[in-house]
Amino acid sequence: MIFIVLIAAFVAADQLTKYIVVRNIEFGDKISVIDNFFYLTHWRNTGAAWGIMQNGRYILVPVTVVLSILIVYFIFKNSNKFYRFSLSMILGGALGNLIDRVFRTDGVVDFLDFQFGNYHFPVFNVADTFVVVGTLLLAYYTLFIYKEDKK
């Protein structure tokens, strides 16, 4: 049950931040948070993370739905809380972006914008962060905890 609440919290955090951006920053505008490093930039992405598969909405929506169902299955199949938390984070992020893909025809709202010297990292959002951090936690689980669970 706690994992359903966590997933809902991850989705809510993502959607709330996107709502704040859409209501307060004009599309394409950039607000400096830390000069030459971190900006809030209202952008839309019609593809997947980091701009791959542009205009791939009709592929990304059904793939996300199928993968989300699989993730729910694995959350309830495994009893390890670390594993379940990792998958909950991934699912919360996936559902946050799925909501945008279904209800925003102009793309997923992105706004976290980082620059490192001459390198400009692709603009992303809180949902993307949840997916990446959840995936890193899942990798950690697979490499270091899974073996202990099997003993």
Swiss-Prot record:
UniProt keyword annotations, A-Z: Aspartyl protease, Cell membrane, Hydrolase, Membrane, Protease, Transmembrane, Transmembrane helix
Chief location category: membrane
Keyword Transmembrane: yes
The keyword NAD is assigned to this record: no
GO CC annotation: plasma membrane
Active site residues of this protein: 110, 128
Transmembrane portions of the chain: 56-76, 82-104, 126-146
UniProt topology in membrane: Multi-pass membrane protein
EC number: 3.4.23.36
Highest taxon, organism lineage: Bacteria
Subcellular compartments: Cell membrane
Catalytic reaction(s) noted: Release of signal peptides from bacterial membrane prolipoproteins. Hydrolyzes -Xaa-Yaa-Zaa-|-(S,diacylglyceryl)Cys-, in which Xaa is hydrophobic (preferably Leu), and Yaa (Ala or Ser) and Zaa (Gly or Ala) have small, neutral side chains
PROSITE patterns to which the protein is assigned, alphabetical: SPASE_II
GO biological process: proteolysis
The protein's annotated pathway: Protein modification; lipoprotein biosynthesis (signal peptide cleavage)
Catalytic EC class: hydrolase
HAMAP family for the chain: LspA
Family stated for the protein in its record: Belongs to the peptidase A8 family.
Functional summary from the UniProt entry: This protein specifically catalyzes the removal of signal peptides from prolipoproteins.
Protein name, as recorded: Lipoprotein signal peptidase
Native species: Acetivibrio thermocellus (strain ATCC 27405 / DSM 1237 / JCM 9322 / NBRC 103400 / NCIMB 10682 / NRRL B-4536 / VPI 7372)
Gene: lspA
